[in-house]
């Protein structure tokens, strides 16, 4: 919040929601309300943000991973439907339904901006690119076994460079990292799947009291809460 000018703290709503979601894998009603209170925003305003972006989940997801499969043009042409079929076979026949063992869930989303390495799947903050049905099925099996597959291209391709390597602009080749920037950071931190199930370094989560149970918040109730809060504020004046 200190990154934003005085009076503009509400600009931190997206990163705060993202950090809140990392605690339980999805945004519970108490989490949304805690972010709203922290920023001095009406509950409904924070809920509006949470419902606008598909990176935010408003219902429970798999304990290990929630797969977001890009379903727009480039990925579909390159085989995204095969990835969806893998999810239906190994996780559940419908999106947003948690697997029987509680480990996984999935959904199809709009373009994730990795068209050069299509098809791809996002898990939390990480991209797994250049997938085939076989590679994706193996990736799920690795996660189920407690392993953490390296994000990025699953064929060894560096970022979006030619699969056979550069034929020009080779001056920067010497000494470059093994992976492109975002993948290298995730690998260096060892921070990939951990940030989905909330097992990374604990943050302050005032809405997670001892023995507290997470409950989904019907939109109507959140709206009512916002109205009640506004009415109380007016009465106080």
What are the functions of these language-model segments?
Residues 1-237:
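Signature of N-terminal electron-transfer/Fe-S-associated modules in redox systems
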């Amino acid at each position: 919040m200190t990154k934003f000018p005085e009076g503009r703290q509400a600009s931190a709503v997206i990163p705060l929601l993202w950090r809140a979601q990392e605690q339980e894998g999805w945004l519970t009603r108490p989490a949304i309300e805690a972010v709203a209170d922290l920023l001095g925003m009406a509950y409904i305003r924070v809920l509006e943000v949470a419902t606008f972006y598909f990176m935010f989940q408003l219902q429970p997801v798999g304990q290990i991973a929630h797969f977001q499969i890009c379903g727009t043009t480039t990925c579909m042409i390159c085989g995204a439907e095969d990835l969806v079929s893998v999810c239906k076979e190994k996780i559940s026949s419908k999106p947003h339904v948690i697997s029987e063992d509680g480990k996984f869930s999935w959904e199809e989303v709009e373009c994730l901006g990795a068209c050069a390495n299509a098809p791809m799947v996002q898990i939390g903050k990480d991209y797994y690119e250049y997938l085939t049905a076989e590679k994706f099925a193996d990736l799920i099996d690795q996660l189920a076994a407690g392993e953490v597959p390296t994000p990025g291209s699953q064929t060894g391709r560096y970022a979006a460079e030619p699969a056979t390597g550069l034929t020009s602009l080779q001056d920067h080749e010497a000494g470059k990292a093994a992976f492109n920037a975002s993948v290298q950071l995730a690998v260096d931190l060892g921070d990939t799947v951990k940030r989905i199930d909330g097992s990374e370094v604990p943050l302050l989560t005032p809405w997670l009291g001892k023995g507290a149970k997470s409950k989904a918040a019907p939109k109507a109730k959140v709206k009512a809460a916002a109205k009640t809060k506004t009415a109380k504020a007016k009465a106080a004046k």
